[in-house]
Amino acid sequence: MSDKRRTFAVIDGNSLMHRAFHAVPPTMNAPDGRPTNAIFGFLNMFLKMIDAFNPDGVVVAFDKGKPRVRMEMLPQYKAQRPPMDPDLHAQFPMIKELLTALNVPILQSEGWEGDDILGTMARLGEEAGCDMLLVTGDRDMYQLVTEHVNVVSTRKGLSDVAIMTPESVDDLYHGITPALVPDFYGLKGDTSDNIPGVPGIGPKKASALIAQYGSLDEVIAHADEVKGKMGENLRAHIDDALLSRKVATIRTDAPVELDFEATSFPAFSADEVSAALGTLGITAMQNRFLALIGGEGGAAAASSVFEIPAMVRAAAGDADALGAVAAEVSHAIDAGEWVAAVVDDDKEEGALFGLTRTLWLATSKGLFALEEGDGASTAVVDGFNFAHGVIAGVLARLFMEGRVASPDTKALLHELSPIDSSEPELMDPLAVDSTCIFDTVVAAYLLDSDRSEFDEAYLADTYLQMALPAARGAEGACEDAPAPAARTAALTLALVAPLRECMARENAANVFDGIEMPLVPVLAKMERAGMLVDPDRLHSLSEGLATQITEVERSIRDLAGDETFNIGSPMQLSHVLFDVMGLPTKGLKKTKRGYYSTNAKVLSDLARDHEIVRLILDWREKSKIKSTYLDTLGPLRRGDGRVHTTYNQTITATGRLSSSDPNLQNIPTRSELGRTVKTAFSAGEGSVFLAVDYSQIELRLLAHLSGDEHLVRAFNEGEDFHAETAARVFGVPVSEVTPDLRSRAKAVNFGIVYGQQAYGLSQSLHISMAEARDMIDRYYEAYPGVRTFLDNVVARAKQTGYAETMYGRRRHIPELKAKNPQLRGFGERTAMNHPMQGTAADIIKIAMARVSRRLEEEGFAAHMILQVHDELDFECPIDEVERLTTMVRDVMEHVVDLHVPLIAEASTGITWADAK
């Protein structure tokens, strides 16, 4: 493309809206409840396209009505497609209103598809001397590619795109030029559009035939030379091939036009766009759009890019520069200012080590870089002791005397207290005052716990209303672009005040200051403690399980009558179970690839009646245990012979901790295989495992929060709660409650906590919907206070948009406003559950901090080494077991005063498996 020609982007509106709808979770809604996830994704892609290509003009094409033009040629064209999802359909008028506010022309014509409008615009634009960018996810558009028409092909998600030029089309199709793409589809067909093509000819064979003969016409002319079944199909379906090519050919004569000279972008009113975005509740993008224009929005645009402060770098060995930086940091510490700290090891992606380690510090005076030297120094500069290195010296004083802000405070603590306990510890994390640390990602998480990522662009846009400048090494970065870690440090400092303000407004400050920040040093200490694992035991278990897996595989293949299929392939497994063996498919859904699902739910339902399915589930469990734990835990051991999990505070929407690398919380607890894995974890010599677990904490919280007199009395009198529920629900004396009735009552008790409805209960107990509904109704009759409480929780959540815990941890639930009944039902169940599950998460976190403090204050040699949901695990010297058990239970049972007692139960064992 030429640099001198004007560039126009023509967006395939239907393609991008469909892609956005399926890529962005359906939890985004306008204030009035209308779904907006497709609009959000569309606008995100729109802005990325503008940033990447800076077109002089933008237009958007949409389908309008049925595709009359192609249906006249092929009546079954797209006939197999299901109706558009109502939530997606509802968003098309809204995106068109937004595009109108953005002054972006909308092109559509009755009976014509957006593809043909893109084709027409490509021709008209090229004739007008413009370079054209066609933004679409449809590969058949590649036929339009020329020197001055490129296709911006959206691929995975919304951000992965490929720029298709004549050369790249040729490479993709192995010698096929853009003009021959319709010929390619003439042979291959297109199942998504119901275009038949020639049976048995896929993309590789279609490419090979056209490359060999030069065109579809020549392939047909030489059809007698094509051997075998493919030749037979070709000769029998010549008319289908010619028709398919015709249908796949993009028209360039749609009845649309555009004045290219008069069309430009951006050319919109800041007020109109702000109002349109505000109506839909998509305010986070407002400044990204305003940054595109001048005029009234110009002031906003001028200040909308985050400015990186001036930088001062102290290179390794430069004593004068080091002294100057140390003086500035000392001043910030003495003044009680927040100092943002980020360590950068300058390593390439995938590398273990970088060439240079740099500590970036941001203060109110600017941005400072301290490079690590090669050796230790005995120098004490301005109150900093650099005996263990520059980075350690600065961080130690910052943590002990200053106020530290970081996007990952725990990782920063590990600079001084390494995860591998065989490495020397320079500072005990518990010595840090939690009121003097501020983790920006944890703060952002508390404000939006359903969000999966808190990347810097999102944080800057949401809390500073600014765009980030490109960092060094990124596409579009200028020569003096900041290092990524430098930008992170500057942004972190800038975020402290607005995040603190937002937390105060959202009632999240108490959770942040009282629960989450005190927990950070505790988690750092637990991660360093790690868990001792026996590699020989793991190896032995793995070998034994491998033998069992082989035996199960043999049994599966014998029952299937197929020695070759891949049991681990969902597609091949589906074929064997449903096509070959004829297992029932009633009620089963097919995947996008056209085969029946073989997920755990499907197989569990079938397992009751089919031995092969039971064996497949057994094979899956054994294979997962072997690959996920037995074969991977050994290599994860550090120099101290221990594995060190990482605790995550910002992953779960409920507030619970999660663990990773390895995930020790997900080892199955009720499975014999899971117990087997835990036998490889042992306490050190002279020590045992101590496990202390809350008993029925969520049910006890339900009793407290609902105030139901029968529920409260049952717990206060120490009754068998599940038996008591069975007696009340089934109308029998407690003495006559059978194990089956108790089991059913237990399922109802825990199901109610999770907002379970009749369908869920019927599935878990394998009973009819009517019976499940009757059980739930009788439960609410037995405990009327529970029904009132849950109804009030849902009503309040619908009014406020969130549910919250006893401690004020909020979970925003946009699904409550969804028009889709299933999503709305999920939102209601989430609202019911959060007060209990979220409060339980808060309580265990508070207990962890208090237990940790008592361990230090009372001189225990024991270490808290693991947290799994409602359980704390310790490695404890044998002579401390009784004292530690008493202390931990005392702390856990008195975190909070409830209407019912909190009960913590303890057990010990030589291995983790024994401590149950």
Report the location of each language-model feature:
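Conserved RNase H-like, two-metal-ion catalytic cores of nucleic-acid enzymes
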Residues: 6-9, 13, 19-59, 75-76, ...
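Non-catalytic nucleic-acid-binding/docking modules located in mid-to-C-terminal regions
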Residues: 3-5, 56-59, 104, 127, ...
